[in-house]
C-alpha cells in the first residue's frame, strides 16, 4: 500500500537557504538514479508552520524503509554529526488514494 512520508525541519531564525537540502540531494544522486518505489517528491518552506517540509509518496512502507536505511541515512548522518542540521520530525502514514 502506498504511503506518504512527511519530514519537517524547523526554520531557524531568518535562514531561508536550502544549502543542506541541496547538498543531500546532490549526494543522493536521486535525479540520475531515482530510488525504487518513489512516486512523488516535494520540498519547500511553509512559513505559516515555520518549517521546511518534505512530502514524499512511496509505493510502500518497505520501499521508503529501504531508501531511508540504504541511501538517506548514510548520507545525512555524517552531515548532521558535522553540524549540518538536525534530524527532522518524520511521519509516515498509509494512503487511501493519491494522484500524481
Identify the residue ranges that each predicted region occupies.
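Short S/T/G/P-rich N-terminal loop/turn motif that feeds into the first structured element of a domain
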Residues: 1-73, 82-100
Amino acid at each position: 500500500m502506498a504511503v506518504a512520508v512527511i519530514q519537517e525541519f524547523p526554520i531557524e531564525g531568518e535562514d531561508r537557504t536550502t544549502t543542506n537540502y541541496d547538498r543531500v540531494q546532490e549526494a543522493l544522486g536521486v535525479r540520475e538514479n531515482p530510488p525504487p518505489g518513489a512516486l512523488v517528491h516535494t520540498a519547500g518552506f511553509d512559513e505559516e508552520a515555520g518549517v521546511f517540509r518534505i512530502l514524499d509518496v512511496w509505493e510502500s512502507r518497505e520501499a521508503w524503509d529501504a531508501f531511508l536505511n540504504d541511501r538517506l541515512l548514510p548520507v545525512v548522518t555524517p552531515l548532521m554529526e558535522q553540524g549540518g542540521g538536525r534530524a527532522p520530525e518524520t511521519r509516515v502514514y498509509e494512503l487511501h488514494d493519491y494522484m500524481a
